[in-house]
Each structure stands twice: as C-alpha cells, then as structure tokens.
Amino acid sequence: MLDKRKFYINGKWVSPSKPNDLEVINPSTEEAFATISRGSKEDTNSAVSAAKQALVTWSESSKEERVGLLEKLLDIYKKRYSEMTEAISMEMGAPMDWSRDSQTSSGQSHLEDFIVRLKEFKFDEQFSPETNNRICYEPIGVCGLITPWNW
C-alpha cells in the first residue's frame, strides 16, 4: 500500500501537524491502495504562509523563467507518466488504457497548453500609441481553491 501522508510545503515533504489518516479506496476492487493525510487548519496555514513567502520572488520572475519552470514540470510529468496512469487508474477504479489515454494525457495537454499560452501572454499592454495608458498584469496573492471532480 502506498504511504502518501506527507505534504509538500515550502520546498520540503513534511509530516502533518496532527495525524489524521485516510485510506484511499480503489472503487473497482473496494480495497485500500494508499494512505493519505487529512490536512488540519495548522497545515493549511503553514502552506499559505510558505506560498506568501514564495510569491515575493515569484512575482518578480520573468516570463522566460516561468516558462522554464513549466517546461521542467512537463519533463517530470512525462518521466512519471506511467506512474501517474497507474495512480489515476487505482483512484478512479478505471481501466489502465482509459486512465492513460484520457486522464493522464489530459494533464500533459494542459501543461503543454499553459506553456504555449504563457509564451504568447502580454504582461504589459499599451492601450494605444497616442496614450501612455497601460494594462499591467501582476500576481496579486495566494489563492485557495476547492474544485470538484478531482480537477
């Protein structure tokens, strides 16, 4: 059984502030295949604090640096493709072929699309040549998202 009870916070894998394990069940076998941790308010606060600290340097990074990081992430994704396919298959109780061809491939497609769009994105736009009015896009802060359906 996989042990995935640590959180990645501030560049390190850390144990939760309080043990609160949850077994992840494969719907097709009804058997547990992994143990994860339920985060606490303290864990969330640690992650948000670390993200706020990281925002200081991230907000000053260039488009090229951000593209480089996404390309590195995409390279790691590709190297771990079969591992992710297997994890998605177990989590969803789905056939491996469908997990690989539909789910894992869509994650890769999203990263590839983000890279293309970031390369094209204008962080600073002038309204017209006659004015000095501009739109400047900057990171504004840390966001917490709760999304449905594993997305």
Name each model feature, range by range.
Residues 1-131:
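N-terminal Rossmann-like NAD(P)+-binding subdomain of aldehyde/semialdehyde dehydrogenases
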Residues 124-151:
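Conserved small-residue-rich beta-alpha loop and adjacent elements
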